[in-house]
Every structure is written in C-alpha cells, then in structure tokens.
C-alpha cells in the first residue's frame, strides 16, 4: 500500500520474496555481463544473470553497435598489434564466424596501405583514433546482432548460469558496507535475488549508484542507429573510390540531411546488401532522463 500526497507518494514497507540465492549475481546481460557470468560459472560458482529485456547482448545486439573495435594495443616499431580481448571474446567471434555472422581482417591485412584501407574500411576495421590517411587496418569484428543473441544464449545455457530475463533492476540490497543482493521489478511484482558477490554490468552504473557509490555525470552524443537493406555495396564502394570528389559531395549532402554523422557513417555487415548506419548525431540529451530519451527517439526517427 502507498500513501498519496500532492507532490509525492509515500511507499510503505513491503515483503519481497527471495527467488534466487547464488554465489554470484550479475546485473546486466550485455557483452560484459554475459562474459562475467560465464567466467564465474566456469570457475565453479553458482551464478544468476539478470537482464531487463527478452534477449542477451545489450548494446551489441539490441543497441545494434555492430563492430567490436578498440580490441588491440597498436604495435610500435614495426611490431604487430597486440590483441588484448581474447578468451571468451574469441569464443564469441569463432561461434559467430561459424554461423557466417562475423567478418574481420586476417593478420596479414592489418597494415597501413590504401589497398587494405579500401578493402576493410567499410567493415569498420580501421584505427579511428588516427587522423592521417590511410588509417591502419586493425583487428575489429563486424557481426550480426541476431547471431550475437543466439551465441550469447548458447554460451550462458552451456555454462549452467541461472538466467532471469524480463527482470528490471530496481535497487541494491545493502547490508553494512556490502551489496548482498538486488531487487528487480517483474510482471509478478518485485523479487529479490541474493548473492555473495554482486556484479554491476548495467552499463550505466545503475547498481553501484543505487548502493550509494559516487559517480560523475558526463555528456556524449546520442545516436539512434539503423540498418538499410537492398544496398549494392560493391557499386557504392566502387563509386567512392573511382569518383572521390563526386562521392565527397554526395556524402556531405547526405550528412546534412541526416543531421550529423561520423565520417564512416555507413558500414557493411555480414548480411549481404544490408548496411549499418551509425547516425544521426544528437547532442544535448540526458541519457538518464525518460523525457530526454523520448525526445531523442522522436528526433532519431523523424529528423
């Protein structure tokens, strides 16, 4: 029961059922949360993985951020790049590739040359941090989001992780100075999940902030990405490289219509004829504000 006032509602104490107790509780089933849950389970821990949506993958799948990049330390003095994300990430990529759902350059193509740039830039496999052209090719992976969901689910199930979908994190359970569990909102009401170790993999620090951790608030460009089908990418790339000045004019015109975008605002995907559009850029929105996010959705859909 709740007590209603003019400007607020006073919620009275409630009895919340404990629906799971495990060694480890991971909140958020994006790439980080799935990897944390699988790793803990393989080390012999009982694990509960909590996700608010009906699928796994977070921004990688539902958010359609369709390139795994920033996975290397660039080599110096003619030494090759060091791939720093291996282990479970490598398992993901290998399984995606087995489903024809991941594409990345072989080591011999990871060099700085115009030939390789033309071959791999539209896959997003370039060092975006370098401004000089051609940018070096590096180990990055273009993937299909639905395949990512399938691979995530397979790995979680095989690892024996207890998965709780459709469970929206609500608040941390804190005893003394320790987080000992979480409360989630579900269609059946609020439920408690307890654990000896609780991992925040929400992406927005929801769990840690709820537990009282200090944080800083920043601002970044909001983007509503999308995909286009029926694109002849071979012809598009050929036109770009054979008619560079005309292509630049068209590209500038497109970006003005879109409302701001990265230089490589469209990229190829493992699905033939389908491109990923990482745009438009929409600065000034608060990612914590429901009203701000609604406004961003309207702008992203309608310009």
Regions from the language model: what does each represent?
Residues 40:
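Aromatic pocket-lining residues of Rossmann-like dinucleotide-binding sites
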Residues 205, 209-303:
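Rossmann-like dinucleotide-binding core of oxidoreductases
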Residues 16-30:
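Beta1/beta-strand and adjacent pyrophosphate-binding region of the FAD-binding site
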Residues 20-22, 188-197:
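Core beta-strand elements of the Rossmann-like FAD/NAD(P) dinucleotide-binding domain
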Residues 33:
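N-terminal Rossmann-fold NAD(P) dinucleotide-binding loop
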Residues 2-5, 13, 19-21, 45-46, ...:
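Conserved N-terminal/central alpha/beta ligand/cofactor-binding core
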Residues 27, 193-203:
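Short hydrophobic core segments
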Residues 173-192:
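Conserved beta-strand-loop-beta-strand element in the redox core of flavoprotein oxidoreductases
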């Amino acid at each position: 029961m709740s007590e209603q006032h003019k400007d607020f509602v006073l919620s009275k104490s409630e009895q919340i059922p404990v629906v799971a107790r495990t060694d480890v509780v991971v909140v958020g089933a994006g790439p980080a949360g799935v990897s944390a849950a699988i790793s803990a389970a393989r080390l012999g821990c009982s694990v509960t993985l909590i996700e608010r949506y009906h699928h796994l993958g977070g921004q990688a799948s539902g958010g359609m951020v369709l390139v795994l990049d920033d996975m290397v330390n660039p080599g110096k003095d003619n030494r090759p790049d060091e791939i720093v994300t291996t282990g479970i990430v490598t398992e993901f990529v290998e399984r995606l590739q087995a489903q024809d759902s991941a594409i990345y350059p072989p080591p011999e193509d990871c060099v700085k040359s115009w030939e390789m740039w033309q071959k791999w830039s539209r896959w997003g496999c370039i060092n975006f941090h370098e401004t000089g052209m051609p940018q070096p090719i590096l180990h990055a992976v273009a993937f299909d989001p639905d395949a990512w969901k399938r691979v995530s689910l397979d790995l979680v199930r095989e690892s024996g992780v207890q998965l709780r979908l459709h469970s929206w994190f609500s608040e941390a359970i804190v005893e003394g100075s320790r987080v000992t569990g979480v409360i989630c909102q579900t269609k059946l009401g609020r439920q408690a999940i307890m654990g000896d170790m609780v991992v925040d993999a929400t992406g927005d620090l929801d769990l840690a902030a709820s537990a009282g951790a200090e944080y800083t608030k920043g601002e970044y460009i909001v983007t509503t990405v999308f995909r286009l089908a029926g694109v002849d990418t071979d012809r598009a790339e050929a036109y770009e490289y054979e008619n560079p000045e005309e292509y630049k004019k068209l590209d500038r015109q497109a970006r003005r219509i879109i409302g701001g975008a990265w230089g490589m605002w469209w990229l190829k995907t493992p699905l033939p004829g389908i491109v990923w559009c990482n745009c438009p850029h929409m600065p000034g929105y608060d990612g914590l504000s429901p009203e701000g996010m609604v406004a961003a959705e309207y702008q992203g859909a309608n310009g």
